[in-house]
From Swiss-Prot:
It comes from Aquilaria crassna. Pfam families: Terpene_synth, Terpene_synth_C. Pathway: Secondary metabolite biosynthesis; terpenoid biosynthesis. This is Delta-guaiene synthase 1. Induction: Up-regulated by methyl jasmonate. It catalyses: (2E,6E)-farnesyl diphosphate = delta-guaiene + diphosphate; (2E,6E)-farnesyl diphosphate = alpha-guaiene + diphosphate. Mg(2+) 3 binds at D444. CDD domains: Terpene_cyclase_plant_C1 (cd00684). Its cofactor is Mg(2+). A motif (DDXXD motif) lies at residues 299-303. The Asp-Asp-Xaa-Xaa-Asp/Glu (DDXXD/E) motif is important for the catalytic activity, presumably through binding to Mg(2+). GO terms for biological process: diterpenoid biosynthetic process; farnesyl diphosphate metabolic process; response to jasmonic acid; sesquiterpene biosynthetic process.
Amino acid sequence: MSSAKLGSASEDVNRRDANYHPTVWGDFFLTHSSNFLENNDSILEKHEELKQEVRNLLVVETSDLPSKIQLTDEIIRLGVGYHFETEIKAQLEKLHDHQLHLNFDLLTTSVWFRLLRGHGFSISSDVFKRFKNTKGEFETEDARTLWCLYEATHLRVDGEDILEEAIQFSRKKLEALLPELSFPLNECVRDALHIPYHRNVQRLAARQYIPQYDAEPTKIESLSLFAKIDFNMLQALHQRELREASRWWKEFDFPSKLPYARDRIAEGYYWMMGAHFEPKFSLSRKFLNRIIGITSLIDDTYDVYGTLEEVTLFTEAVERWDIEAVKDIPKYMQVIYTGMLGIFEDFKDNLINARGKDYCIDYAIEVFKEIVRSYQREAEYFHTGYVPSYDEYMENSIISGGYKMFIILMLIGRGEFELKETLDWASTIPEMVEASSLIARYIDDLQTYKAEEERGETVSAVRCYMREFGVSEEQACKKMREMIEIEWKRLNKTTLEADEISSSVVIPSLNFTRVLEVMYDKGDGYSDSQGVTKDRIAALLRHAIEI
């Protein structure tokens, strides 16, 4: 790549190039918008009418508790639970009776268990003991029951042997039964075996489940139609937000000014929409989409293109946080720096306009500085040849992975609670933030370490673990996969122990972890977004659901 294209970048420096592919979307999201709501007041009226019908179904008193549990679960899985948060909480509190399960079959017990644990209610896994035979083994051949049991096992915490047995039992049975199943159950099972619901991006899970539920003979027509209309209405909002972000990206002309970096504004929006899709979080989504865009540019500059001297100058400029500092960094970096300052200034103005104050913008700036410092350390690893210990690498990578930053910035953008106390607590990297960050790092490194080594990088969780503990590459990768499961159990545990302050961090921690699970399930789906990532973005942001 010609250094001359990048302004004052030195032409005699041997620079690396990751050869990232261009955007797969071109200007599509700059011009594309849904016409679903155009001049169609009847759709809005129908949506409101159906919402009331579904609410009535949810709150009506009934002695048929299995049906009420199933309905509550379907509302959530169809992606419309955010309309009924108060009603769902009330229903779950009623269902949180430890004796109720004595009358449930295994299918209902599994759904009940997953629902309650998934919403922070403490339920013992002992509820599954009565479904084991005299030999201590589970007994069922029913595919739907096995599917529900398998989904429930992913809410397990450390030490729950019965759920470890249940996941092995149900997975083995489902894999054997899958070829014999018909639609829609076969797709439900296939999706769960690929990515269980608890670990899936909730918006993507809803997109998958809507046509599956629509094909069920026992479906509720009003609920099915409501889910379709609501999905399309939300999609129209998300398209408008992405169009605005694409316009900002285009105005700065990042792709042509920084051709070594990933051009991934749509993928970044998909990431942030996966973390919080609800309309009330529009401001947070817009801000975080720009943040992930600018952070990605900085990451690529430090990882791939910049010299150690150049990135050190940029780090110093970030510490100053002053437009005057732009004069002290290489010309090619200046567009990143001015873009960065502009994002935070715009966010501050929007917070003041929306809420009357800037809602702890200083926390946002500090956590951004922190991630740049972590990038600096990683650049020093590469340029000096320094190999950190495994613990030293992981301590820095918890920050460089970005999840602490994204969680704190999401909290500021959402602004739903006593923010300063929550931010003080979240800034200490509590257990749930640490678990989320570690899962992200293990997943990321497993999928990217070989590509990074082709660029000359030798520091990763895999390589540091191999070096320190004297194990093979295969053994190190196996250990990383085991650690992902351990940290998921720890993350699950923290959701059950959450107090008033930490409960506000539960959903961001879970959702960012879910996005990473999905984005990297078939490789680095952010850097290489030409395959399944493109398909998923199209499903969520391009193709409406047929009514």
